[in-house]
Amino acid sequence: MTGRDALSDGRARSRALVPGGPSTGSRPRGFAITDLLGLEAELPAPEGPGPGSGCEGPAAAPRAGPGLGGSCPARGALPLGLGLLCGFGAQPPAAARAPCLLLADVPFLPPEGPEPLAPRFPGRPPPSAARQKRSESVSTSDEDSPSEDRSDRKASPAPSKRKKRRHRTVFTAHQLEELEKAFSEAHYPDVYAREMLAMKTELPEDRIQVWFQNRRAKWRKREKRWGGSSVMAEYGLYGAMVRHCIPLPDSVLGSGEGGLLGSCAPWLLGMHKKSAGTIRKAESEEKLAGLWGSDHLKEGSSPHQAGPQRGLEEGSPVSGVEDVVIDLSSSTRQETDRAQQGVGAQGRPDSEGLEGLQPGKEGAL
């Protein structure tokens, strides 16, 4: 038989001898050190309180003394912690004891301190101080958050504010006249033109720029008819006419009878007239080049044949500029012929050489 078995047998005998104690089979085994080691057999069961005693201090104090302090034989030999556990293990179950436990009965705790002592480490603050700091941080964060919310509320309405509307500029009749005149000259004036216009009208340059933007928008909305929407539309139509050899519409030609300003497409009509003049000029240059080549081929012809030819040219429907050019070319040819004849006379005066050589030349021809 081992020592543990002997202890368990002794515990059973002691329970049987104690009057009014609980039965051995009905009491469950606890998980305390005394229950696990079998030390409860050597502890006598304390007397239970009366039915009407309750939790009175004077009645409970003398009862707790022998249960915790003097009845444990191994109390002096065991360390401090094991002695405390031994005293707690010797107590009966909660059903047989008083309904409340007085912390003042424990000899290791002061009567005033309800909280158990916690081990303190040198580098770690006590739990009460940590809880206090945590509560302070929570309170400070709660106090700071409304101020941040208030600052956000103050900052958020600032962008949502609508900007003040700028006052409308009232233009005088003189200013409008100058602006309309500049708009008729150029729809997109540069900075220099706007600055000059600002000096004339005594208006700021940015106001003039805004006026031109509004005026261009108004002009685009108003000019909806064909050929009058914009200069770029007229330019595109003119390019299509040139590429595909499309004649100018009769409506544009008819509107230009009273002048370019009265036409529905003044720029297009002006470009058409310029192109027609360029074509006419090219044809006249070709005629002049042909006449000049024929004159060089007829080096041996007499100057008398130039007269009928000039008469025919005068009778032809050619412009006055072409007649002047032809006359200049014939006179130049006559002068060159006379110079050649003067060199071949060999000592004769120019007039006699010309008179003597003229009949011979005619006879040879």
From Swiss-Prot:
<comment type="similarity">
    <text>Belongs to the paired homeobox family.</text>
</comment>
<feature type="short sequence motif" description="Nuclear localization signal">
    <location>
        <begin position="161"/>
        <end position="166"/>
    </location>
</feature>
<keyword id="KW-0217">Developmental protein</keyword>
<dbReference type="InterPro" id="IPR051775">
    <property type="entry name" value="Homeobox_domain"/>
</dbReference>
<feature type="domain" description="CVC">
    <location>
        <begin position="224"/>
        <end position="277"/>
    </location>
</feature>
<feature type="compositionally biased region" description="Pro residues">
    <location>
        <begin position="114"/>
        <end position="128"/>
    </location>
</feature>
<feature type="compositionally biased region" description="Basic residues">
    <location>
        <begin position="160"/>
        <end position="169"/>
    </location>
</feature>
<feature type="compositionally biased region" description="Low complexity">
    <location>
        <begin position="56"/>
        <end position="65"/>
    </location>
</feature>
<dbReference type="GO" id="GO:0000976">
    <property type="term" value="F:transcription cis-regulatory region binding"/>
</dbReference>
<dbReference type="GO" id="GO:0000981">
    <property type="term" value="F:DNA-binding transcription factor activity, RNA polymerase II-specific"/>
</dbReference>
<dbReference type="InterPro" id="IPR009057">
    <property type="entry name" value="Homeodomain-like_sf"/>
</dbReference>
<feature type="region of interest" description="Disordered">
    <location>
        <begin position="1"/>
        <end position="65"/>
    </location>
</feature>
<keyword id="KW-0805">Transcription regulation</keyword>
<keyword id="KW-0716">Sensory transduction</keyword>
<keyword id="KW-0371">Homeobox</keyword>
<feature type="DNA-binding region" description="Homeobox">
    <location>
        <begin position="164"/>
        <end position="223"/>
    </location>
</feature>
<dbReference type="Pfam" id="PF00046">
    <property type="entry name" value="Homeodomain"/>
</dbReference>
<protein>
    <recommendedName>
        <fullName>Visual system homeobox 1</fullName>
    </recommendedName>
</protein>
<keyword id="KW-0844">Vision</keyword>
<feature type="region of interest" description="Disordered">
    <location>
        <begin position="114"/>
        <end position="169"/>
    </location>
</feature>
<feature type="short sequence motif" description="Octapeptide motif">
    <location>
        <begin position="31"/>
        <end position="38"/>
    </location>
</feature>
<feature type="region of interest" description="Disordered">
    <location>
        <begin position="294"/>
        <end position="365"/>
    </location>
</feature>
<keyword id="KW-0804">Transcription</keyword>
<dbReference type="GO" id="GO:0007601">
    <property type="term" value="P:visual perception"/>
</dbReference>
<dbReference type="GO" id="GO:0005634">
    <property type="term" value="C:nucleus"/>
</dbReference>
<dbReference type="InterPro" id="IPR017970">
    <property type="entry name" value="Homeobox_CS"/>
</dbReference>
<dbReference type="InterPro" id="IPR023339">
    <property type="entry name" value="CVC"/>
</dbReference>
<dbReference type="InterPro" id="IPR001356">
    <property type="entry name" value="HD"/>
</dbReference>
<keyword id="KW-0238">DNA-binding</keyword>
<feature type="compositionally biased region" description="Basic and acidic residues">
    <location>
        <begin position="1"/>
        <end position="12"/>
    </location>
</feature>
<dbReference type="GO" id="GO:0048666">
    <property type="term" value="P:neuron development"/>
</dbReference>
<comment type="function">
    <text>Binds to the 37-bp core of the locus control region (LCR) of the red/green visual pigment gene cluster. May regulate the activity of the LCR and the cone opsin genes at earlier stages of development. Dispensable in early retinal development.</text>
</comment>
<keyword id="KW-0539">Nucleus</keyword>
<feature type="compositionally biased region" description="Low complexity">
    <location>
        <begin position="19"/>
        <end position="45"/>
    </location>
</feature>
<dbReference type="GO" id="GO:0006355">
    <property type="term" value="P:regulation of DNA-templated transcription"/>
</dbReference>
